[in-house]
């Protein structure tokens, strides 16, 4: 999300945590269980308010202009010509199921152009309003930066439709130089791919227009700048425009590795030494999974903290007594002049919103495109179905009732954050209560999907407007149901874990009452601390707390 802070080779610098943001996963239609193309995205940025964006379909006057504001800051950048017609966009998917996500890789800082008009966020939402296919979106985005200039630092974009998925990587040409250098590679249908704030495209085919597109000067510009001097066939976009450093490896590529490791154990084992900086062979842009992948699999992947791998962060002192899989920002720290770091997992507390986009070619667009969406950290919220035809925002996902500094009990973002911030400090004690509610809701939405879509498809064949209204209402209902359930969960957690103890419950989950009717104290359990944590306290304090 935010421009990436440049890292020194072999060491992370202090304060980098706030800049290393966002993760994208991609699943080709031949790699998914049901033939869906799947794209996931977490918008990870401290201070960003999590909301669902909506741009209604519209017709525009011939000479209409559009004002462009930087997505991150709201800064006015300039104006561009408006398209005659723009399409309905809900979140990061449009009415034709075209979906776009991103991660910022930053790259060479000297290539930033402060005079450019198109920032990465505007590229996403303008392209969604103007494109019917992924390839068309790539053309819209690259044409826009060519005509109006590119304002942001280096970006990786996931661009997909019901039939194909691409990764587009782009970086500017420097101050006052209009345009960008870029390359786009199609992900094979039977493969999965990922990017996470480090440029991922190395060598690419120079003569395969069906599967690879690139700017005419992507190699020659690198030669002019002194970034590359070899043969064209050996050119690596990533090496030229975003040389890998320790931060890019351990805070960024490690998330890609974790995703690959989940779905292809051989690849996980092969590239673990690369992540540990023991070997230099980079991971491929895409791999084949061991088994077909589902939407629920990708939802779970977005909740990953390296559990069960050598990068697991739940078993050291930083996890505290209750195995918290999070670390506070910044991720780097210094002790006696030596710099250290904490791992940066896929799931992280600063996520504003996360989605898993499901695109299907065997259904009408209005029914086939589902943005499984939630605000806050994927691990601590519920993915609810948002159909791409939705033409009205669920109130709980709207910025009209709350913002980044305005709390509301009606806001999904603040309700999810409220509960998450209670759970994290005592994670292992409390997480099962949250997971039970989360699983129940997501199981319900998954089980209902086929029936809802069958009914919607039948409606669509007779009256498309009726189907759109039906799916819009369903989108609103499921979002609100999740928020209402989360409020009750928060109330339950406050009561159950008040004052550091655990109130006892009956078999049906209700709280035990005092033994006598006039009693005022509920039965409680005093959990204390795990044995391993107590042993660490004794090691650190010696006889300080010894009982004589």
Model-derived regions: residue spans:
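A contiguous strand-loop segment
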Residues: 22-120, 140-293
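Sec/Tat signal peptide C-region and signal peptidase I cleavage site
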Residues: 15-21
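Short, well-ordered beta-strand elements within core beta-sheets of diverse protein domains
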Residues: 124-130
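Substrate-recognition/cap regions that form aromatic- and gly/pro-loop-enriched pockets
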Residues: 322-458
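Histidine-centered catalytic/metal-binding microenvironments
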Residues: 438-548
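Sec-dependent N-terminal signal peptides
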Residues: 5-15
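Glycine-rich, aromatic-lined ligand/substrate-binding cores of catalytic
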Residues: 221-374
């Amino acid at each position: 999300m935010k421009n990436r802070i440049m890292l020194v080779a072999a060491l992370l610098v202090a304060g980098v945590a706030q800049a290393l943001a966002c993760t994208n996963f991609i699943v080709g239609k031949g790699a998914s269980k049901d033939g869906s193309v799947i794209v996931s995205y977490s918008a990870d940025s401290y201070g960003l308010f999590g909301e669902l964006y909506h741009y209604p379909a519209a017709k525009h006057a011939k000479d209409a202009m559009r004002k462009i504001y930087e997505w991150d800051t709201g800064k006015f950048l300039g104006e561009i010509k408006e398209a005659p017609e723009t399409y309905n966009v809900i979140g990061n998917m449009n009415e034709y199921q075209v979906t776009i996500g991103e991660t910022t890789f930053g790259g060479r800082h000297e290539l930033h152009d402060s005079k450019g008009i198109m920032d990465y966020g505007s590229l996403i939402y303008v392209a969604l309003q103007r494109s019917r296919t992924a390839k068309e979106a790539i053309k819209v985005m690259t044409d826009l930066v060519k005509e109006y200039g590119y304002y942001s630092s280096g970006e990786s974009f996931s661009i997909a439709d019901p039939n194909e998925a691409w990764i587009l990587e782009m970086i500017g040409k420097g101050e006052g130089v209009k345009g960008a250098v870029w390359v786009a590679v199609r992900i094979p249908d039977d493969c999965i791919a990922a990017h996470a704030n480090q440029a991922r495209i190395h060598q690419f085919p120079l003569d395969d227009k069906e599967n690879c597109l690139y700017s005419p000067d992507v190699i020659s510009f690198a030669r002019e700048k002194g970034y590359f001097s070899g043969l064209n066939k050996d050119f690596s976009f990533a090496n030229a425009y975003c040389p890998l450093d320790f931060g890019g490896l351990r805070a960024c590529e490690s998330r890609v590795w974790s995703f690959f490791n989940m779905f292809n154990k051989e690849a996980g084992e092969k590239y673990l030494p690369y992540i540990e900086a023991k070997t230099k062979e980079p991971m491929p842009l895409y791999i084949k999974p061991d088994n077909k992948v589902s939407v629920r699999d990708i939802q779970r992947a977005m909740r990953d903290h390296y559990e069960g791998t050598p990068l697991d962060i739940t078993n050291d002192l930083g996890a505290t007594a209750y195995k918290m899989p999070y670390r506070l920002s910044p991720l780097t720290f210094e002790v006696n002049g030596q710099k250290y770091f904490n791992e940066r997992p896929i799931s992280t507390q600063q996520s504003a919103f996360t989605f898993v986009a499901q695109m299907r070619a065997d259904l009408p667009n209005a029914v086939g495109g589902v943005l499984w969406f939630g605000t806050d950290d994927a691990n601590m919220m519920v993915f609810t179905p948002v159909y791409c035809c939705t033409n009205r925002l669920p109130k709980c996902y709207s910025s009209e009732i709350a913002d980044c500094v305005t709390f509301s009990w009606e806001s999904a973002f603040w309700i999810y954050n409220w509960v998450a911030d209670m759970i994290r400090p005592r994670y292992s004690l409390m997480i099962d209560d949250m997971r039970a509610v989360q699983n129940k809701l997501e199981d319900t939405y998954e089980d209902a999907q086929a029936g809802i879509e069958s009914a919607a498809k039948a409606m669509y064949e007779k009256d498309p407007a009726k189907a759109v209204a039906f799916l819009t209402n369903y989108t609103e209902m499921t979002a609100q149901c999740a928020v209402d359930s989360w409020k009750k969960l928060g109330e339950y957690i406050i009561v159950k874990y008040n004052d550091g103890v655990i109130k006892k419950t009956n078999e049906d989950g209700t709280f035990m009452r005092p033994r006598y009717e006039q009693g005022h104290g509920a039965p409680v359990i005093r959990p204390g601390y795990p044995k391993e944590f107590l042993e660490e306290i004794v090691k650190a304090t010696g006889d300080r707390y010894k009982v004589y």
